[in-house]
Amino acid sequence: MELALALSLIASVAAAPTATLANGDTITGLNAIINEAFLGIPFAEPPVGNLRFKDPVPYSGSLDGQKFTSYGPSCMQQNPEGTYEENLPKAALDLVMQSKVFEAVSPSSEDCLTINVVRPPGTKAGANLPVMLWIFGGGFEVGGTSTFPPAQMITKSIAMGKPIIHVSVNYRVSSWGFLAGDEIKAEGSANAGLKDQRLGMQWVADNIAAFGGDPTKVTIFGESAGSMSVMCHILWNDGDNTYKGKPLFRAGIMQSGAMVPSDAVDGIYGNEIFDLLASNAGCGSASDKLACLRGVSSDTLEDATNNTPGFLAYSSLRLSYLPRPDGVNITDDMYALVREGKYANIPVIIGDQNDEGTFFGTSSLNVTTDAQAREYFKQSFVHASDAEIDTLMTAYPGDITQGSPFDTGILNALTPQFKRISAVLGDLGFTLARRYFLNHYTGGTKYSFLSKQLSGLPVLGTFHSNDIVFQDYLLGSGSLIYNNAFIAFATDLDPNTAGLLVKWPEYTSSSQSGNNLMMINALGLYTGKDNFRTAGYDALFSNPPSFFV
């Protein structure tokens, strides 16, 4: 009798999990013992042929009886340019490679719009677990869901007594997902990659209950481009995040990324990149360039895309492909939307790494003098006046002891201008943009963090995306934030229920009297003030559009 019972228990544990979707289709997943996974589920029609560059169309085929046990291919990737390997010591390079954010993901395909659901073992419909929906990063040029398996986070949530369901969604990147220009705006196809993410959220709203998730307890979170994507969804439709009369998400977590400092979709640079892509693909003289681009082979479009500037090119964060105001879903520049209160009213966590710009600074090592730095900034920020560039140069001086990686004195100056440029890129794209958001956002409880965990790492310091390493491998004090606190926030809307030894203060403004940041270093957690580099903040954000790209 005991043997029969034991065999029955083993069989039940090993049985493949199933879920019945809203349309009645029953699908089978993978029992991975430490979790159950449904991987590579289509949520949209393949965006190929006439659907290339267009809004995603909900998947209409039958999935009944199918098995979903492996990740689908990533969406097509743009190979990043750059020679950073030549300029970094091994210790820094090893961590960069572990972060997996700066490299193309293979295999890739245009037929890529799939979603993944991973849950604790034994979870059934009706469990009503909180849901964490992950949006991967990669500069809006690379990335895929297969790069960030959530096994560690699921296991940690179980150990905390706060089990969660993890969802990740593939979305189109680079030219396939974020092509801009007059033709794209006229057709209404701007920001297709964001629309992929949004459709994935709608799929979750319709189906996650079948997997044991609670559609009213969804937290969207992401890193880098994923973090900026979370911000875009907070601002989407002037903050209307409802679907079928209910919110798609109730909270947001942003790791290294806030408002995208981007011109409109029909702005000068978006049109320049559209024309360059068309020319590269042999469509430059076509009467309908967009139709021509839809007609070229996947390989031709990939080659054409790879010959437009990537995020490791000299132009760096002046990205070829990124979310842009379209007048429809992103109705204005994102800084204006935040100032005007046009956002979803939800609690948020938003934070950064201390040296967000160093990795990107390796792309401009030929800039070595003050005059060259000034010209670099003028080329990067074409809307800024001479006076604004002068103010920027004063706020971020050539003194290498004040540059990034910060607090390293005369060390880590690859060139006389490397630390200056790294400081500007990091503050504009990430660290001080976060402060701008927090100073203007009143939609819900706010928490913020800043990590200095790798302050001793040569050249890069606590560089952009290093948090992924600590998040995936449960290492160091950073993991207490990126796993424990995030899980607690998704469950209770309060990171302090994670039982951290240091209480995480709420953020009211950068000038509040008490501490407002959770700080992370190699020794542990502590609190601090968000009051550094005020001259840089004023230079960059007194008139944000001056530094749009």
Swiss-Prot record:
Glycan-carrying positions: 329, 366
UniProt GO molecular function: triacylglycerol lipase activity
Disulphide bonds in the chain: 75-112, 283-292
Database matches in SUPFAM superfamilies: alpha/beta-Hydrolases (SSF53474)
Top EC class, one word: hydrolase
Organism listed in the record: Diutina rugosa
Keywords linked to the UniProt accession: Disulfide bond, Glycoprotein, Hydrolase, Lipid degradation, Lipid metabolism, Signal
Similarity remark: Belongs to the type-B carboxylesterase/lipase family.
Active site: 224, 356, 464
Catalytic activity: a triacylglycerol + H2O = a diacylglycerol + a fatty acid + H(+)
Domain of life: Eukaryota
An example Gene Ontology biological process: lipid catabolic process
EC numbers on record: 3.1.1.3
Signal sequence range: 1-15
Keyword Disulfide bond found: yes
Name recorded for this polypeptide: Lipase 1
